[in-house]
């Protein structure tokens, strides 16, 4: 054990140093999600059900678009690892354009969905609440994509603190805005769920504005700004952003789609089940976002070493990340387990919702291993720019395994919401195992290194 620690010690330190600011930034996102759910839930259980539906739909779109922006990380990470700073700045310029185009396409698709939202089998009483909230979140999509472009760039150059501070500030602004607009403080009208949406839109706009100001004015970005301004557009970089970004987007999108489509199925069970699902999603995002921070650090480290052609440290960075991910999973799962009987009551006054939340803790705990496994090795594969097979893996794991199992357990066996949630461990663990095998196969060490 001591020998293993000595081998991975430097990687542990580097990953924690890189990942901790990302994790702290994600804690801000988690706190925002909790605050949203708490404030909306205590304002109205019906509004909580409406928020659950809309947030699930937009989580799919936002994670899909975030996945596309991840294509920048291995490009910038490789350039930064070989000291090509001007080219890294040029990559950012091209990434912002690509992200804007993707945001435009997604906005068109989501507008079409808006006009058909009444045909998705949701409870009739939720539709008047769903529609205005949906439109406000739709308006914020372009700002999410611009923020992601800057964030993936700064992560790729190992500056994870800038995005952390901007995220924390934006989320604090969002929480304050929620309180004022949901409950009608400072002389403003009580807007409920719509107020939460307006607050989210405003905070996302401000985060982009602040990121632009920091990039333009901070001296530490000077060597990158030369390439950003002077090297212009690059067909090669733009093409590579698309060849990397789309497979990652579809891989992440299919994972999220399994949760979003599960929310549609849960909506068939009624408002109480949908509200319970929203509470559990807020809790599950607590662990996912923490894993995400460490996974992003793995992608950066792997891309840096991959740019240098150092396969040994590519592998060690990935496995060190997995060790840390599992340790984090044990800690987080223990916290959730110890608080299992209180979680539902923190989010809503409804005893029915609180009881249903407690019943979902077991499937939640079971899938933590699979979630940590798939996040680690999906990011490791992104770091080595091996992303195309991830789409097939995601399709098998989430559409051929997770969704059918969820429908079978939830509706054929009549286990209800617990049955739908029992599918998540199957999908995430199967995805993790396939992604691990792909990474293991693609990073085999030469015999000379193996022997040494």
What are these regions (language model features)?
Residues 69, 137-155, 163-171, 196-211, ...:
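Short runs within selected transmembrane alpha-helices of multi-pass transporters and secretion channels
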Residues 48-112, 144-158, 162-163, 263, ...:
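Small-residue-rich hydrophobic transmembrane alpha-helices
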Residues 27, 31-49, 117-124, 180-191, ...:
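Helix-terminus/linker motif at the lipid-water interface of multi-pass membrane proteins
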Residues 17-36, 136, 147, 170, ...:
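Transmembrane helical elements of multi-pass membrane transporters/channels
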Residues 1-19, 76-142, 188-245, 302-367, ...:
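Short alpha-helical transmembrane segments in multi-pass integral membrane proteins
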Residues 7-38, 42-43, 59-71, 75, ...:
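N-terminal transmembrane alpha-helices
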Residues 20, 24, 54-57, 97, ...:
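Hydrophobic residues within alpha-helical transmembrane segments
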Residues 22, 26, 37-38, 74, ...:
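Transmembrane alpha-helix boundary and packing residues in multipass membrane permease domains
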């Amino acid at each position: 054990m001591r020998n293993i620690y000595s081998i991975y010690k430097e990687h542990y330190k580097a990953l924690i140093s890189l990942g901790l600011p990302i994790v702290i930034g994600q804690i801000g996102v988690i706190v925002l999600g909790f605050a949203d759910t708490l404030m909306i839930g205590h304002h109205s259980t019906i509004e909580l059900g409406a928020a659950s539906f809309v947030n699930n739909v937009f989580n799919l779109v936002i994670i899909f678009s975030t996945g596309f922006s991840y294509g920048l990380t291995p490009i910038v990470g490789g350039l930064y690892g070989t000291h090509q700073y001007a080219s890294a700045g040029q990559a950012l310029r091209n990434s912002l354009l690509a992200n804007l185009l993707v945001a435009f396409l997604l906005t068109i698709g989501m507008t079409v969905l808006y006009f058909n939202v009444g045909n998705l089998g949701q409870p009739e009483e939720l539709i008047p609440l769903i529609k205005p909230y949906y439109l406000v979140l739709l308006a914020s999509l372009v700002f999410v994509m611009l923020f992601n472009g800057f964030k993936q760039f700064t992560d790729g150059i190992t500056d994870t603190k800038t995005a952390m501070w901007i995220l924390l500030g934006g989320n604090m602004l969002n929480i304050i805005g929620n309180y004022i607009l949901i409950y009608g403080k400072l002389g403003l009208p009580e807007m409920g769920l719509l107020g939460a949406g307006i607050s989210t839109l405003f905070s996302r706009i401000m985060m982009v504005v602040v990121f632009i100001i920091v990039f333009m004015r901070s001296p530490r970005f000077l060597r990158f700004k030369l390439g950003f301004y002077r090297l212009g557009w690059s067909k090669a970089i733009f093409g590579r952003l698309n060849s990397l970004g789309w497979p990652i987007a579809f891989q992440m999108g299919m994972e999220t789609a399994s949760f979003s489509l599960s929310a549609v199925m849960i909506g068939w069970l009624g408002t109480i089940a949908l509200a319970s699902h929203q509470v559990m999603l807020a809790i599950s995002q607590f662990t996912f976002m923490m894993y995400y921070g460490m996974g992003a650090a793995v992608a950066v480290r792997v891309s840096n070493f991959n740019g240098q052609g150092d396969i040994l440290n590519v592998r060690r960075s990935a496995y060190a990340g997995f060790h840390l991910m599992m340790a984090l999973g044990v800690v987080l799962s223990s916290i959730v387990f110890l608080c299992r009987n209180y979680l539902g009551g923190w989010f809503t006054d409804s005893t029915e919702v609180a009881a249903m939340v407690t019943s979902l803790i077991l499937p939640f705990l079971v899938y933590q291993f699979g979630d940590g496994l798939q996040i680690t090795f999906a990011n490791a594969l992104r770091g080595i720019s091996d992303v195309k097979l991830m789409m097939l893996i995601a399709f098998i794991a989430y559409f051929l395994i997770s969704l059918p199992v969820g429908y079978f357990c939830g509706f054929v066996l009549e286990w209800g919401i617990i049955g739908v949630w029992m599918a998540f461990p199957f999908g995430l663990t199967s995805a993790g195992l396939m992604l691990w095998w792909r990474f293991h196969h693609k990073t085999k060490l030469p015999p000379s290194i193996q022997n040494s």
